[in-house]
Amino acid sequence: MKQFKEFKKFKEVKEFKEVKKFKEFKEFKMATVKNFEELAIFQKARELSKKIYPITRKEEFKLDYRFVQQIRSASGSIMDNIAEGFERGGNKEFLNFLYIAKGSCGEVRSQLIRANDVGYLKPQEYNELYNECRKLSACIMNLIKDIKASDITGIKYKDSEFAPPP
């Protein structure tokens, strides 16, 4: 019986250390990002936006000013919301803005489908941009899941009375 209690205690201590080690790793991983420009999803959103602009300068888009504005605005909105959410300094707000960025990513996909349907895009252009949007949306969702699973509340609450107890 005594051996069982010692084993149970050892197992609990080992599990506690593993959990603590994981939390420290997550904190280190999250703490290494100092500004939104370092975020991979921001960089991917920026690349997508940079690809949308030259595509919408093509002859096929010339007379559809409103559509051009919409797709450019939506693609820029992805990166803008990632930046704004990150700069707010709290995870709850960052999550809200990530969901908005994910919604804008869906909006760009919808607009790409429409552009393809009316013949504005070549199949290769459409497939490349559409797949890039899908991947970006998945990356945003993965970051959302990581933040939700994390105990970190964000820089806004560091050394604050609102920070959760250690």
Regions found by a protein language model. Name each.
Residues 1-166:
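Amphipathic alpha-helical assembly/interaction segments
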